[in-house]
Amino acid sequence: LKCNKLIPIASKTCPAGKNLCYKMFMMSDLTIPVKRGCIDVCPKNSLLVKYVCCNTDRCN
């Protein structure tokens, strides 16, 4: 997950209220993101799932 890049093609701006970009990985395979998108609060990691969050609404 690359944060704070301002490349228009690759960047994503989140809707109001969900101003953090995140990626979700399964702990069994940290190389392939399962889900990505915008969220209001960065979730905590669990035994099965790891979250990687940006502190901005732009990511690629």
From Swiss-Prot:
One GO CC term on file: membrane
Subcellular location field: Secreted; Target cell membrane
InterPro entries assigned: Cytotoxin_Cobra, Snake_3FTx, Snake_toxin-like_sf, Snake_toxin_con_site, Toxin_cobra-type
Gene3D superfamilies reported in the protein's UniProt record: CD59
The keyword Secreted appears for this protein: yes
PROSITE patterns cross-referenced by the UniProt entry: SNAKE_TOXIN
Expressed in which tissues: Expressed by the venom gland.
Keywords: Cardiotoxin, Cytolysis, Disulfide bond, Ion channel impairing toxin, Membrane, Potassium channel impairing toxin, Secreted, Target cell membrane, Target membrane, Toxin, Voltage-gated potassium channel impairing toxin
Pfam families per record: Toxin_cobra-type (PF21947)
Single Gene Ontology BP annotation: killing of cells of another organism
Function: Monomer: shows cytolytic activity (apoptosis is induced in C2C12 cells, but no cytotoxicity is observed on INS-1E). In addition, this toxin shows insulinotropic activity that may be mediated by the modulation of potassium channels (Kv). It induces the increase of intracellular calcium release. It induces insulin secretion from rat INS-1E cells in absence and in presence of glucose, without affecting cell viability and integrity. In presence of glucose, the insulinotropic activity is increased, suggesting a possible synergistic effect with glucose.
Note: Negative results: does not induce direct hemolysis of human erythrocytes and it also does not induce potent vasoconstriction.
Subunit structure: Monomer, or heterodimer with alpha-cobratoxin (AC P01391); disulfide-linked.
Protein name from the UniProt record: Cytotoxin 1
Organism taxonomic ancestry: Eukaryota, Metazoa, Chordata, Craniata, Vertebrata
